Swiss-Prot record:
GO molecular function: DNA-binding transcription factor activity, RNA polymerase II-specific; RNA polymerase II cis-regulatory region sequence-specific DNA binding
Motif (Antp-type hexapeptide): 117-122
Subcellular location, record wording: Nucleus
GO CC aspect terms: nucleus
Taxonomic placement: Eukaryota, Metazoa, Chordata, Craniata, Vertebrata
Species this protein is from: Danio rerio
Composition bias type Basic and acidic residues, residue spans: 211-227
Identification of the protein by name: Homeobox protein Hox-C6b
Record's function text: Sequence-specific transcription factor which is part of a developmental regulatory system that provides cells with specific positional identities on the anterior-posterior axis.
Signal peptide coordinates: none
Keyword DNA-binding: yes
Gene3D superfamilies: Homeodomain-like (1.10.10.60)
Domain of life: Eukaryota
């Protein structure tokens, strides 16, 4: 076990003839590795200092000595006023951030039971908010100006071309589908009205014919009585 320290083949010598690792008995109770290597550490690293300005300059720095290394108070900070100023600036920034966060929380806090409904959440032209069992579309409500313009167009043209339908939709701020549906409904209404008028005219003509027949029969009866 002691062959590592006593083997002459593993030992090397300096120019002065001193051994780098002199043979020391492991069983010696007074062996101190720090004190043992301190002369060589002092000889090799004597007066070794750091040129970095962040480290303090100390003379006679000996590496491997038994005493602990004493770092300077200004090792990491060159100016002693840097740390207080940084703390003061950080405190102000933290205070402003806390105030902003509190104000934002005060603005955004709403009662839990209230749910805000935005316009994009509602269905267009729906008579009921939400998606229940009744999902029918509500009737499109046209303004008086839109209705008047559509009636004028229907008076001249019962059917529209695609080009004319696009022009009317752009003029009245409506969609092509709305124009198409309006004209379909208007044609149905017009047919009903025309059928009703024709029926009334037929009934009126039949009633007038019956009245004339009654008058003729009455005249003939009077003539027969006189005869």
């Amino acid at each position: 076990m002691n062959s590592y320290f006593t083997n002459p083949s593993l030992s090397c010598h300096l120019n002065s003839g001193q051994e780098v690792l002199p043979s020391v008995a492991i069983s010696s109770t007074n062996y101190d590795p720090v004190r043992h290597f301190s002369p060589y550490g002092a000889a090799v690293a004597q007066n070794r200092i750091y040129s970095n300005p962040f480290y303090s300059h100390q003379e006679n720095v000996m590496f491997g000595s038994s005493r602990p290394y004493d770092y300077g108070s200004n090792m990491f900070y060159q100016d002693k006023d840097v740390l207080p100023s940084c703390r003061q600036g950080f405190g102000q920034t933290q205070g402003s951030l806390t105030q902003d966060y509190a104000s934002d929380q005060g603005k955004t806090v709403e009662p839990k039971g209230v749910v805000q409904i935005y316009p994009w959440m509602q269905r267009m032209n729906s008579h009921r908010v939400g998606y229940g069992s009744d999902r029918r579309r509500g009737r499109q409500i046209y303004s008086r100006y839109q209705t008047l313009e559509l009636e004028k167009e229907f008076h001249y043209n019962r059917y529209l071309t695609r080009r004319r339908r696009i022009e009317i939709a752009n003029t009245l701020c409506l969609s092509e589908r709305q124009i198409k549906i309006w004209f379909q409904n208007r044609r149905m209404k017009w047919k009903k009205e025309s059928n009703l008028t024709s029926i009334l005219n037929d009934n009126g003509s039949v009633g007038a014919g019956q009245d004339t027949d009654k008058e003729e029969t009455g005249e003939t009866a009077e003539k027969d009585e006189h005869d």
